A protein has these predicted regions:
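Conserved helicase motor core of SF1/SF2 NTP-dependent helicases
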Residues: 1, 31, 45-47, 53-167
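ASCE P-loop NTPase motor cores of helicases and related translocases
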Residues: 1-40, 162, 166
C-alpha cells in the first residue's frame, strides 16, 4: 500500500510500502522487492507523490475506482507515467458513476467553462467534469459496461434510481 500510516488501518500497516521495505538494506533489495510485488494500492494523491515507483516497475493494469470523482489534473501523472522509454501502465480500467458521485470541484460554471475549440472537440467543455464522465459520454457502447447486479440495497429500493436515472 502506498500512503501514510495516518490514513491506514493498523491491520494493514505492515503492507505500507515504507514498512514493507524496512527489511531491505540495499538499493538492489528494494528494487527486487518492488519488482516482485504484484499489486500496489493507494489514492491517486499518494501514487502521484511517488511517481518514481514507475522508474522501478512496469504495470500491465491500473484499476482506478471512483474515477467519476477524480478531476483530470489528479490523474494526468499516473496516465502519462513512463517506465524506461514506454508507458509505465499498459491498460487502465476506470470505475465509477458520474450520476451518483460526480467530480468534486469548487469552481463556478463560468470559471470552469472551456472556450477553446480544440479542447471542445475532444469533449472538454467544463473543467468540473471528470475524465471518466467525458470518456463515458464520448465512448461507444463496446467500450463501457454497466453494473447489472448490486448488493448494497434491496432490489425494490434500487428500482427507483435505476428507472429514474439509468434506463
Amino acid at each position: 500500500r502506498i500512503g501514510s500510516e495516518l490514513s491506514c488501518d493498523k491491520r494493514f500497516a505492515p503492507y505500507l510500502l515504507k514498512n514493507s521495505l524496512a527489511d531491505c538494506p540495499k538499493l538492489t533489495d528494494i528494487q527486487q522487492k518492488i519488482a516482485h510485488t504484484r499489486i500496489f494500492t493507494g489514492t491517486t494523491t499518494a501514487i502521484n507523490s511517488r511517481l518514481h515507483l514507475f522508474n522501478l516497475k512496469h504495470f500491465t493494469l491500473a484499476i482506478i475506482d471512483e474515477a467519476s470523482q477524480i478531476l483530470e489534473p489528479d490523474l494526468v501523472g499516473i496516465l502519462s507515467a513512463r517506465h524506461d522509454r514506454s508507458n509505465a501502465i499498459d491498460k487502465f480500467i476506470l470505475i465509477g458513476d458520474y450520476k451518483q458521485l460526480p467530480a468534486i470541484a469548487q469552481q463556478e460554471e463560468e470559471e470552469a467553462r472551456v472556450d477553446d475549440p480544440l479542447l471542445q472537440s475532444i469533449g472538454l467543455n467544463d473543467c468540473r467534469n471528470s475524465l471518466f464522465e467525458r470518456l463515458y459520454k464520448q465512448s461507444k457502447e463496446d467500450f463501457r459496461s454497466i453494473l447489472h447486479k448490486q448488493g448494497r440495497m434491496h432490489p425494490a429500493i434500487s428500482e427507483f434510481p435505476n428507472q429514474t436515472f439509468y434506463y
